[in-house]
Swiss-Prot record:
HAMAP family named among the record's database cross-references: SecA
Record note on quaternary structure: Monomer and homodimer. Part of the essential Sec protein translocation apparatus which comprises SecA, SecYEG and auxiliary proteins SecDF. Other proteins may also be involved.
Reaction(s) catalysed by this chain's protein: ATP + H2O + cellular proteinSide 1 = ADP + phosphate + cellular proteinSide 2
Organism this protein belongs to: Picosynechococcus sp. (strain ATCC 27264 / PCC 7002 / PR-6)
SUPFAM superfamilies linked to this entry: Helical scaffold and wing domains of SecA, P-loop containing nucleoside triphosphate hydrolases, Pre-protein crosslinking domain of SecA
GO annotation terms (biological process): intracellular protein transmembrane transport; protein import; protein targeting; protein transport by the Sec complex
Entry superkingdom: Bacteria
Matches recorded under NCBIfam families: secA
Protein name: Protein translocase subunit SecA
InterPro entries assigned to the protein according to its UniProt record, in alphabetical order: Helicase_ATP-bd, P-loop_NTPase, SecA, SecA_CS, SecA_DEAD, SecA_motor_DEAD, SecA_preprotein_X-link_dom, SecA_SF2_C
Gene3D superfamilies cross-referenced by the UniProt entry: Helical scaffold and wing domains of SecA, P-loop containing nucleotide triphosphate hydrolases, SecA, preprotein cross-linking domain
Similarity section: Belongs to the SecA family.
Enzyme class, UniProt record, top EC level: translocase
Gene transcribed to yield this protein: secA
Main localization category: membrane
Length: 938
């Protein structure tokens, strides 16, 4: 109705940008006639214009003014360097990104190329542009591949990888455009704010950021804080004992019924009943689980949570002697990530693996607050519209939908719902069989490792060949192989959450992938160091690779790069195979036999299979062979491609509605890319988690109402509405949870900014003497206010205690007597003490400098940083504890958030006072050794 009256706001927005696109197109011919040098010279012209700007506002105005020319320059450069030309819709995407908005672009519409436009334009300012992707591999690929365009035009391109040292990072952050991952960017920010000298700081002030897959970073990851932690000792036997006790506690089946604890699946929490407390105390032989001397509550709660809410092969897998988290959004394993607050240890105890040490937070920030540090932020994704409200409310980011270059031909078929899971799996298997018969490729999306194995078993029964892609290490190894052939005729692929797999399923098979896999087969065994085999397979996903590969049982197993033969559409002709062997021999001659790490070898192949310019003769030789193999395969896959299109394209089956409609849409988006035909259908059951947890009683009622056979699908409007409702409920529930995290973290965020700003001042400050003297004067004023009440007559003032306290801090004031100040007013006492402090400080400085010139300046910086870091760390723990306890105040009719803000602020002020006082005390107590010695950096 509104759309009819007022027009679609999205269409209105795009219409506003249309004249800019027309202007860029008009310039195309002029720029096509320029020489390479003249085209690159444009960068110098643009920069000269920008140099005239005197403020950030003026800079933005000039950028808007030169946008059509700059975009036309990038478009021409991309054509010359990459043989890729931006479509009009990609220009629209670039404009939206430059305006600091989110561009929603469908899978396969070339988001990577779109980012080059705003990155170049904003890179001209020299203040730095960060292009953020989800993993190291993609960052490296984009920096090498898209970076060519920027380098051709004279901008510098940097890349940040987790393995780099500080010097390398500084150099890369100084570039005009830097490609990096969200986690590395966040951790570098935290590390910079723990640095002890300004030379250790790697980042520049933030300017402009483009986030790829923005929904997965700003929404899915929003609740996950980035934490830098140090280890603390906790007795491991408590975890083991708690795990034993949790086994003996029983859950309540119905509300207020018998049982030791109640499980709240919605909030992912457990609540102990009075019987539960009593039983646990009796089993442990203690009187109180909350006893401060011997606390048990924390351990018991975590053990019960581990038992009830964290399922093996769904939330985590056990690999060797460790518990590894499985990412609920992408279905990938996340090695190195651990649950906090002792939960990971509780799961380790439950699984009987070695319990690792608990950690203490040294610095933390959520992605929400981190990305809000950028003055200008933008992002791209295939699915953002469903989370539009959140982007606008939390990040102040508008979402604009960019139309596809070719019209979509995908059919989304109606959901079918079965009474129970068993019937659903049978129906899915039958649908796969039908599609397999007709020669259509099928992709089945599941929500966990466990579910993917159930459907796999059903397909085995029917004798249907299929590939399985989940977080199990043995399957991850084969990810690139599986995805390469997922679009082949009649292929059946089962995958846990394809979100973030970053890979395109090409109908008829992906000849680029296949060629690269064939190259690996010959290249890797000759080049990779034997000790590196099996430790690591390429981590990353994207155009040319996928997955994280791991050694499943930590024993050195012989690595094989052989792939299953049926992946290739044909055998290589003898002359081509000979050419490949010669190229590999040449590589061995140049690099040495088995001389590279697996990652280095993968990188050589990655560059060989793309168009990045290279001076390495080995890569050039490999590239020639790669193109020949790719062409051989492509001639055959293109025939199969046409057949698959005739048959109707890729069919995507969803086996459960995800908690977020966005993830469902991502799965759907795998079919019908770039104007290909395709179809999608969801198979559901009334026993699915989503309906069970959030659909509640309505669904249970429906279940009884439908007295149908198990294997009869139920198609009912009422049920579909229930489903939609349940999904919206979950989305709102999680949105509220994220909003709450955001509101609570906002309190911390203001404090974090204040403390980091103070820290940076200290790091950059040349003369900290004045700062320490101010600290000391402030401390003296506070002491005066504590012992002197101006309301009382002077004879009742506690001047002796006042001076005793002052001398505790500054022993050089020991000659002062109460009689020296008894005739003064309060302001006069303060002024007098301030003067005495300055004299005392000069004395102290002379004494320290005598032992080693310049030492006092170092001592000032050292003590201020040491106190800030120590007390901030304690403050983080105290704030965490406050946050845990403040929730209970809701029962006392108080708003927990307001209480948290108030008390958090008071705690922060106290911490700032403690920092000041401790610095003053430490500096006056500081006795330098005779031999030249510097205070150690913290």
């Amino acid at each position: 109705m509104f759309k009819k009256l007022f027009g679609d706001p999205n269409a209105r927005k795009l219409k506003r940008f249309q004249p800019l696109v027309a202007e860029i197109n008009l310039l195309a011919e002029d720029f096509a006639n320029l020489t390479d040098e003249a085209l690159a010279q444009k960068t110098v012209e643009f920069r000269a214009k920008l140099d005239k700007a005197n403020s950030d506002e003026e800079t933005e105005e000039i950028l808007d003014e030169i946008l059509p020319e700059a975009f036309a320059v990038v478009r021409e450069a991309a054509w010359r360097v990459l043989q890729m030309r931006h479509y009009d819709v990609q220009l629209l995407g670039g404009i939206v990104l430059h305006k600091g908005q989110i561009a929603e672009m469908r899978t396969g519409e070339g988001k990577t190329l779109v980012a080059t436009l705003p990155a170049y334009l904003n890179g001209l300012t020299g203040k730095g542009v960060h292009v953020v992707t989800v993993n190291d591999y993609l960052a490296r690929r984009d920096a090498e591949w898209m970076g060519q365009v920027h380098r051709f035009l004279g901008l510098t391109v940097g890349l940040i990888q987790s393995s780099m040292g500080p010097a390398e990072k500084i150099e890369n952050y100084r570039c005009d455009i830097t490609y990096t991952t969200n986690s590395e960017l966040g951790f570098d920010y935290l590390r910079d704010n723990m640095a002890t000298t300004i030379q250790e700081v790697v980042q520049r002030p933030f300017n402009y950021c483009i986030i790829d897959e923005v929904d997965s970073i700003l929404v899915d990851e929003a609740r996950t804080p980035l934490i830098i932690s140090g280890q603390i000792e906790r007795p491991t036997e408590k975890y083991l004992q708690a795990a034993e006790i949790a086994k003996q506690l029983v859950p309540q089946v119905e509300e207020d019924g018998p049982g030791d604890y109640e499980v709240d699946e919605k909030a992912r929490n457990v609540l102990m009943t009075d019987e539960g407390f009593a039983k646990a105390e009796q089993l442990l032989g203690v009187t109180d689980l909350y006893d401060e001397q011997n606390p048990w509550a924390h351990y018991i709660f975590n053990a019960v949570k581990a038992k009830e809410l964290f399922k093996k092969d769904v939330n985590y897998i056990v690999r060797g002697d460790e518990v590894v988290i499985v990412d609920e959004f992408t279905g990938r394993i996340m090695p190195g990530r651990r649950w906090s607050d002792g939960l990971h240890q509780a799961i380790e105890a439950q699984e009987g693996v070695t319990i690792q040490k608990e950690t203490q937070t040294l610095a933390n920030i959520t992605y929400q607050n981190f990305f809000l540090l950028y003055p200008k932020l933008s992002g791209m994704t295939g699915t953002a519209k469903t989370e539009e409200t959140e982007f606008e409310k939390v990040y102040n980011l508008e979402v604009t939908i960019i139309p596809t270059n070719r019209p979509t031909k995908r059919q989304d078929l109606a959901d079918v719902v079965y009474k129970n899971e068993k019937a659903k799996w049978r129906a899915v298997a039958e649908e796969c069989a039908q599609m397999h018969e007709t020669g259509r490729p099928v992709l089945v999306g599941t929500t966990s490792v466990e579910k993917s194995e159930i459907i796999s078993a059903y397909l085995h029964e029917l004798g249907i060949p299929h590939n399985l892609l989940n977080a199990r290490p043995e399957n991850v190894e084969k990810e690139s192989e599986i995805v390469a052939q997922a679009g082949r005729k009649g292929a059946v692929t089962i995958a846990t959450n394809m979100a973030g797999r970053g890979t395109d399923i090409i109908l008829g098979g992906n000849s680029e992938y296949m060629a690269r896999l064939k190259m690996r087969e010959y290249f890797m065994p000759q080049i990779v160091k034997p000790e590196d085999e099996g430790n690591f397979a390429i981590a990353g996903s994207g155009k040319n690779s996928g997955g994280q590969g791991f050694d499943t049982n930590n024993k050195q197993k012989k690595k094989t790069w052989k792939t299953t033969l049926d992946i290739y559409p044909t055998e290589l002709p003898t002359d081509l195979e000979q050419q490949l062997k010669e190229a590999v021999k040449f590589a061995v001659d140049q690099y040495g036999n088995q001389s590279l790490t697996e990652l280095e070898a993968e990188e050589k192949l990655a560059i060989a299979s793309e168009n990045a310019p290279t001076a390495d003769p080995v890569v050039q030789k490999l590239r020639t062979v790669y193109h020949a193999i790719e062409k051989t395969y492509h001639d055959l896959t293109s025939v199969e491609h046409d057949e698959v299109i005739q048959n109707g394209g890729l069919h995507v089956i969803g086996t459960e509605r995800h908690e977020s409609r966005r993830i469902d849409n991502q799965l759907r988006g795998r079919a019908g890319r770039q104007g290909d035909p395709g179809s999608t259908r969801f198979f559901l059951s009334l026993e699915d988690n989503l309906l069970r947890i959030f659909g509640g009683d309505r669904v249970a009622g429906l279940m009884n109402a439908f007295r149908v056979e198990e294997d009869m699908p139920i198609e009912s409007k009422m049920l579909t509405n229930s489903l939609e409702g349940a999904q919206k409920k979950v989305e709102t529930f999680y949105y509220d949870a994220r909003k709450q995290v955001f509101e609570y973290d906002e309190v911390m965020n203001n404090q974090r900014r204040a403390i980091y700003a103070e820290r940076r001042r200290v790091l950059e400050g040349q003369d900290l003497k004045e700062q320490v003297i101010q600290y000391a004067e402030k401390t003296m004023s506070e002491i005066v206010e504590a012992y002197v009440n101006p309301e009382l007559p002077p004879e009742e003032w506690k001047l002796d205690k006042l001076l005793d306290k002052a001398k505790e801090f500054i022993y050089l004031l020991e000659d002062l007597e109460p009689k020296d100040i008894e005739d003064m007013t309060v302001p006069e006492i303060k002024t007098f003490l301030h003067e005495e402090v300055r004299k005392a400080y000069d004395l102290k400085e002379a004494q320290v400098e005598k032992s080693q010139p310049g030492l006092m300046r170092q001592a000032e910086r050292f003590f201020i940083l040491q106190q800030i870091d120590t007390l901030w760390r304690e403050h983080l723990q105290a704030i965490d504890a406050l946050r845990e306890s403040v929730g209970l105040r809701g029962y006392g009719q108080k708003d927990p958030l307001i209480e948290y803000k108030q008390e958090g602020y008071e705690m922060f002020l106290e911490m700032m006072i403690d920092i000041r006082r401790n610095v003053v005390y430490s500096l006056f107590q500081f006795q330098p050794q005779r031999q030249p010695q510097q205070p150690q950096a913290v």
